Amino acid sequence: MTRRTPPRPVDVEQLFPEVAPLRRQAVRLHPRAGSPSWRDSSVGGPLRWPDREPWPLCPEHRGSPMAPIVQLYAADALGVVEFPPACDLLQVLWCPRAHDGRWVLPEVHWRAAGAVGTVREAPPLPAGTPYGHVPKPCVVHPELITEYPSWDLPYPLWDALEPRFAQVEAETGWDYQYHLSTAPGTKLGGYPGWGQDPQWPDCSGCGKPMDHLLTVASSEADAAWTPFEDEGVRYESADLMLGDMGGIYLFECRSCPGRPVKDRFGS
């Protein structure tokens, strides 16, 4: 089944042409409880991990195995993120235990699916893994959407547009920040779903601002962003509980070799 986000009831760029140059494409993954295999893109599902490679272990927790979080084949990225040359598979894992100043410790791997060969089964997670830090297995339903900055809107522009934001909300009931700009949920590309001031990282190598790669979110949608197919339907998703219903935001530098990664937490 596909998932389709209802179109916004107003033309954002017509009302606020100043945000048009800041538009970004994102892919809402719409994870829903299921039984994916390693042949599928998934959230919390089995990874197409080569048997010849050791399973990643956390360096801070006595070699505790990392948990599979997201697997995405290039076909399901819908062109939003350019994969490294010869790669068509993105895999994200993390150690779900608390770390010094961080909620989780993630790793990002790019690989060629056809070169994997025999697939290694993930080791079981240790007892005491925090509840809500590892997603339940979900199939995904990739959907291409357009986003505009919310918390990432530059302060001078926000101040200039705020009277029009207020006018549109008064006339339509639609708030720019929560209804018209940035989609909630687990997604590729676009803007992070910040709940407060942005913590956009710079690359330690080149010093440039990093690109948003992926948001892994506790909540998938509110009423305004619920797909048509889920309206009035009770559904199960990844059952994550990251802090106070927050999210983990992964960033990468696409200019430096190896595409180094940093993460941020937001609630």
Set out the residue ranges of the language-model regions.
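Preference for intrinsically disordered or flexible, low-complexity segments
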Residues: 1-267
